[in-house]
Amino acid sequence: MSISRREFLKANAAVAAATAVGVTLPVKMVEAAESDNIKWDKAPCRFCGVGCSVLVGTKAGKVVATKGDPESPVNRGLNCIKGYFLSKIMYGKDRLTTPLLRMKDGKYHKEGEFTPVSWDVAFDTMAAKWKHSIATKGPTSVGMFGSGQWTIWEGYAASKLHKAGFLTNNIDPNARHCMASAVVGFMRTFGIDEPMGCYDDLEAADHFVLWGANMAEMHPILWARLSDRRLSSKDCRVHVLSTFENRSFDLADNPMVFHPQSDLVILNYIANYIIQNKAVNTDFVTKHTKFALGVDDIGYGLRPDHPLEKKAKNPGNGKSTPISFDEYAKFVSTYTLEYAAKMSGVEPEKLETLAKAYADPKAKVMSLWTMGINQHVRGVWANNMLYNIHLLTGKIATPGNSPFSLTGQPSACGTAREVGTFAHRLPADMVVDNDKHRAITEKMWQVPEGTIPPKPGYHAVLQSRMLKDGKLNCYWTMCTNNMQAGPNINEEMYPGFRNPENFIVVSDPYPTVTAMAADLILPTAMWVEKEGAYGNAERRTHMWHQQVKAPEGAKSDLWQLVEFSKRFKVAEVWPAELIAKKPEYADKTLYEVLFANGVINKFPTTDCKGDLNDESEHFSFYVQKGIFEEYAAFGRGHGHDLAEFDRYHETRGLRWPVVNDKETLRRFVEGSDPYVKAGEGYNFYGKPDGKAVIFALPYEPAAEEPNSEYDLWMSTGRVLEHWHTGSMTARVPELYRAYPDAQIFMHPEDAKARGLQRGDEVLVASPRGEIKTRVETKGRNKPPRGVVFMPFFDARQLVNKLILDATDPLSKETDFKKCPVKVMKA
């Protein structure tokens, strides 16, 4: 057998990818565990949104090993390096086991020292603060910041407690920082959220196009499947677009490093190329799409008095007007190859190669994107533009033809999006500012008409501003570390946490940066210390049983939310006019109205087939099943169908809609989606007319650009070994040793021009602050001249405090990828 040099290099890239995934590292450890009297059970991985299934090995009440689940259709027995060390995330030396309240002279004090207290004292203190705030300032003075790492029932309980209990929509998940632009993109184009394709498309595509997605490190199991397809199919090609070279470039046939923000130009160029070269699928476009012109100059989601916001003509305006195909073609006609090459810095032949792949009617194309597209001040537009390309060519919802938005958290889809824990959303894609949607939800929740406020609550970035301004006073964060992960910490977030008017509660297993800035820390159960359910990026809902007990004193987020609701009588938090509609509720607790409501509490604990279920034992009913079934009723018959609860414990997950116990691989297409009738071909049924929208949207610049003082673009992101802020992975000795400290990746010539060498300590500064770190001029990430990259996992180097809190005005998602900085020797 002969092999070309190019194929040899590609094969080496695959080996490198497998090594990065961690396939070979812990084999001996796993083999040893097989014969050591360990009990194994399934669970989805605790980390990213891929949704790998792992087998969890327990012994003597402790998780002692994890390995890839060979029965999983997602990861097929593989784990990435983080997945292999899951068994250690719960056993950090500084695990919290008792509530900690800031106290001075025996009572709570904002400037006091953290002091151990009982759960009763913690909840009594919290409840008193909440009741006082609601009574004196109204329900909008309380709020919560949650997580795409919540289980489905935790997110549902949190949303219901706030929207129907405390009468506030001031609840938002950290998925606002990562997936909000994807959500709004789906809703604008299709009228319904989440991908139409599935992971099976990885085995069918001819071309893979990565848009701001370093899959080799951030989604390594999917990258392994993609690599296998590339190396086993001689005609398969990989195109990678990024603002700097990363490990995904190792497999790229068509690598492209573009200037920050110019992806918008490239996307419109491709649409123009398709039209100019008569590659439009005219039949598909005529039958299944329509065109619209979006509003431009929409601002940057900053405070209203910010100069950039005052300058915008249409701040936050997401409206559009119908146009014809010819008008759309004229709109994109100015986005020529020459203009795209000039704006992006990418060689014209590479751009044309990419455009030809999309335009070729015989080629199946899978577009994959994540934070590079979403964490973008025009992230919604970028999502819409990606769909434009697939809709113009009809390359959508068939095997290998898939515009696929990747998620970063294990249940950003299943909990944050599907459950509706955003400040503007309700379950099953309903929204709070729609009268009909509120009425449906109020009926399902058995609360009076008018219970749910019609105005969206404070989104993530706005929560920080309102804390600082003293308008949001009681604030509970769960399952997230926003003081490290969020933007503009110095100017907005930290002042809000330490505002003397505010009482801040953080639920976390560990003393994170966020926890240490709070007034009360609540110790939390983790992962398989509780029963859970996640929903991954391909609409797969996957459940697990509790497999070990949490350390004594640590309680799950679900327990905390439901137990806290017992502290409130309806009459203490609802106005008289609302109680008058349901006077029988006046003397009841929120717990009785929201959770012991005859629906959630109707399933006995004997229904639970797992060995443990501490929450259900405490509440004396199968609380997880009850919440799930109440929640699932929202989507059944409405395109979001979930299977019966018990089915998920029997499987490695099912992809919704699940109709007649059959999952759906691809949506909107006849023969796969049960909501598409025979003879329709396609039906984008999220829209009343069944047609998807192709948007005419322009290029607009970033909120900030480098200047004479801050002369470098900086992007922040992740690395393979750590997940998000490292609050779990940095406590795993093997992962910490593999990557102990963050560095700033620079081009060698940029370092030389500043008198710097690899390993030098430097100051990195933006208009909002500065940090110390060390220079890396080699290694896995290779920025071009003028660009630097720094990961945000290191709690000792809070790089995101340099980031401006500019957001996409439509999705309110922060742009973490484009910040002007200067780098100097420390």
Swiss-Prot record:
It catalyses: 2 Fe(II)-[cytochrome] + nitrate + 2 H(+) = 2 Fe(III)-[cytochrome] + nitrite + H2O. It is found in: Periplasm. GO terms for molecular function: 4 iron, 4 sulfur cluster binding; electron transfer activity; iron ion binding; molybdenum ion binding; molybdopterin cofactor binding; nitrate reductase (cytochrome) activity; nitrate reductase activity. Keywords: 4Fe-4S, Electron transport, Iron, Iron-sulfur, Metal-binding, Molybdenum, Nitrate assimilation, Oxidoreductase, Periplasm, Signal, Transport. Mo-bis(molybdopterin guanine dinucleotide) binds at residues 82, 149, 174, 178, 211-218, 261-263, 371, 375, 481, 507-508, 530, 557, 716-725, 800, 817. Residues 38-94 form the 4Fe-4S Mo/W bis-MGD-type domain. It holds the Pfam family Molybdop_Fe4S4. The keyword Iron-sulfur applies. Binds 1 [4Fe-4S] cluster. CDD domains: MopB_CT_Nitrate-R-NapA-like, MopB_Nitrate-R-NapA-like. [4Fe-4S] cluster binds at residues 45, 48, 52, 80. It is an enzyme of class 1 (oxidoreductase). Substrate binds at residue 792. GO terms for biological process: cellular respiration; Mo-molybdopterin cofactor biosynthetic process; nitrate assimilation. Gene3D superfamilies: 2.40.40.20, 3.30.200.210, 3.40.50.740, Dimethylsulfoxide Reductase, domain 2. Residues 1-32 form the signal peptide. Predicted to be exported by the Tat system. The position of the signal peptide cleavage has not been experimentally proven. The keyword Electron transport applies. Its main location: periplasm. Its EC number is 1.9.6.1. Its cofactor is [4Fe-4S] cluster; Mo-bis(molybdopterin guanine dinucleotide). Catalytic subunit of the periplasmic nitrate reductase complex NapAB. Receives electrons from NapB and catalyzes the reduction of nitrate to nitrite. Belongs to the prokaryotic molybdopterin-containing oxidoreductase family. NasA/NapA/NarB subfamily. Component of the periplasmic nitrate reductase NapAB complex composed of NapA and NapB. This is Periplasmic nitrate reductase. It comes from Shewanella oneidensis (strain ATCC 700550 / JCM 31522 / CIP 106686 / LMG 19005 / NCIMB 14063 / MR-1).
